[in-house]
A protein has these predicted regions:
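Conserved Radical SAM active-site core
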Residues: 1-55, 59-66
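Auxiliary Fe-S-binding modules of radical SAM enzymes
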Residues: 10-14, 58-117
Length: 117
C-alpha cells in the first residue's frame, strides 16, 4: 500500500543509501509482482532513477511472467539457491547457478548481459 511505499522511500532518502534491494519470500511471484512493480516505479520517480534497484528471485530471468519488471529495476539475481553449488567467494549470490544480470544492458542488447562490478 502507499503508506508502506512512502515509508520505504523515506528510509532510502539518506545519502549513504545507494539503492533498494528486494528479496525474500519471492518478490516476483504472481501474487507479489504487481506490488513490487508499483514500489519500483514510485522509488525511481522519487529518486529520478539516481538510486539502483536490485531484485533477487528464484525464477530464471527468461521465465519471469510479468516482463514489465525489467523496465523498473537495474539488476536481477536469478535462479534458486542450490546448497550443493554454494560458493562463499561469489559476489551478490550464494550458488554458482545464479546469475547477476544487468537488466538495462540486457534489454539494450536483447541477450543476457551479466553485471560486472
Amino acid at each position: 500500500n502507499q503508506e508502506v511505499i512512502d515509508h520505504i522511500i523515506k528510509l532510502c532518502e539518506q545519502s549513504h543509501i545507494q539503492g533498494l534491494s528486494i528479496l525474500g519470500g519471492e518478490p516476483l511471484h504472481p501474487r507479489n509482482i504487481d506490488a513490487v512493480i508499483e514500489l519500483c516505479k514510485a522509488f525511481n520517480a522519487h529518486f529520478n532513477n539516481a538510486k539502483s534497484i536490485w531484485v533477487w528471485t528464484g525464477y530464471l530471468y527468461e521465465n519471469i511472467v510479468n516482463k514489465d519488471i525489467y523496465n523498473h529495476v537495474d539488476v536481477i539475481v536469478d535462479g534458486q539457491y542450490q546448497d550443493e553449488l554454494h560458493d562463499f567467494r561469489l559476489k551478490w549470490r550464494g550458488s554458482s547457478n545464479q546469475r547477476v544480470i544487468d537488466v538495462k544492458e540486457t534489454l539494450k542488447n536483447n541477450e543476457i548481459v551479466l553485471y560486472c562490478d
